[in-house]
Amino acid sequence: MPYGDNDWLALTQEPTIEPDLPICDPHHHFWDFRDVRIPYQRYLLDELNADVYSGHNIRSTVFIETRSMYKPDGPDDLKSVGEIEFVQGLAAASASGVYGPTRAAAAIIGNGNLNLGEKVQPVLESLKLASPNRFQGIRQPCGWDPNPEVETRAPEQQLANSNFRKGAQILANMGLSLDITVYFHQLEELADFAKSVPDVTIILNHIGGLYRIGPYANRDNEVLPHWREGIKKVSECDNIVLKLGGIGQPRYGFLWHTYSKPISSENLSNELAPLINYCIDQFTPARCMFESNFPPDKVSYSYNILFNAFKILSKQYSDKERSDLFHDTATRIYKIAT
């Protein structure tokens, strides 16, 4: 297939299931990486609108940092303020109602370096100043892996670092949340970290960082039990909530992006269900939220297909539980007015 191509996605068309069900999408990005060879180099308000208005009732969304539109000069620790300024403008345009009723980036999650310890406070204050009404926290990548072919974006044992924990406490003192990415074999470390900073609301991204390609290919008999045990451990920490998504990224090992025609929502639901239902069983719906992770996940399926799949696999839950999964957990955690 043409990797990351709207024409390919259009080969699988379906009517939207339950089009009136309210949804808050708690995880997407905005970027313009025109100089980088990646799928969907440009994903701004027009591109997001094409997805969120493709059939489902997306009431609001949450922008998650992606190191885009940083300031070109000034102190390194403050360059990420540029991303917040950029997204604040897109959010204001969306809130005008000109494009439709969805409030894009109703909450904004930026980037700040907790390894600064207590010195992170002025950075967080600058981020908040750039978006007084929408900035709700930061995301800090903590993924580390010993294999050189696996992308590592943090030092080993960063979650145990005393400065990192001091920085997290500053975050808590300011009433801000912490989105975190890790790999599946780091989940026990995350549980230990969460217990050390019980006042911090931690949002674990992408079902806890499963990895099933490269050095972890053909090792499901080891990887999946390790992941399940890790999910169980982090679920025991009351200050951690979980995002259900990100599974369309190729590193999750499903290879849907290689199909001659995109997967249907029924088949996608069947393949997602064992992982997602396990997560919900451990965390409960009140601590879980369905996410799109667009555009990274867009290499595997369309927005309409993904949320159709989420609706199919969640039919076993009560109306209240489904409201939590699709909308209420996200708006509560990210403090979005409804």
Predicted features by range, described:
Residues 27, 61, 87, 108, ...:
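Conserved, mostly hydrophobic/aromatic
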Residues 2-11, 75-186, 192, 208, ...:
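Active-site gating/metal-coordination segments in enzymes
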Residues 19-22, 56-60, 100-107, 131-136, ...:
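Short, well-ordered coil/turn segments that N-cap beta-strands
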